[in-house]
Amino acid sequence: MVKLRLKRCGKKQRAVYRIVAIDVRSRREGRDLRKVGFYDPIKNQTYLNIPVILNFLEQGAQPTGTVQDISKKAGFFMDL
């Protein structure tokens, strides 16, 4: 099963997260299937590759709670 989850990047105390499609059995920093966006909580910036995310959701991928909250704040689920 594939999930859309956050992958931590950046420096110490300056976390930046990539939103990735990754297999459930992989660890957080494991190999991802595809990068679908990023989230910077410090600068409050979000980028979502919407066509790719929709493709993964149609194939049965499940977003984690945090990714779902970030997507709602960005207005992604309003478009559906």
Curated annotation (Swiss-Prot):
Its main location: plastid. It comes from Lotus japonicus (Lotus corniculatus var. japonicus). GO terms for molecular function: structural constituent of ribosome. PROSITE patterns: RIBOSOMAL_S16 (PS00732). This is Small ribosomal subunit protein bS16c. HAMAP family: Ribosomal_bS16. GO terms for cellular component: chloroplast; mitochondrion; small ribosomal subunit. It is found in: Plastid, Chloroplast. Induction: Transcribed and spliced in green leaves. It comes from the Eukaryota. Keywords: Chloroplast, Plastid, Ribonucleoprotein, Ribosomal protein. NCBIfam families: S16. Coiled coil: none annotated. One of its GO terms (biological process) is mitochondrial translation. InterPro entries: Ribosomal_bS16, Ribosomal_bS16_CS, Ribosomal_bS16_dom_sf. Belongs to the bacterial ribosomal protein bS16 family.
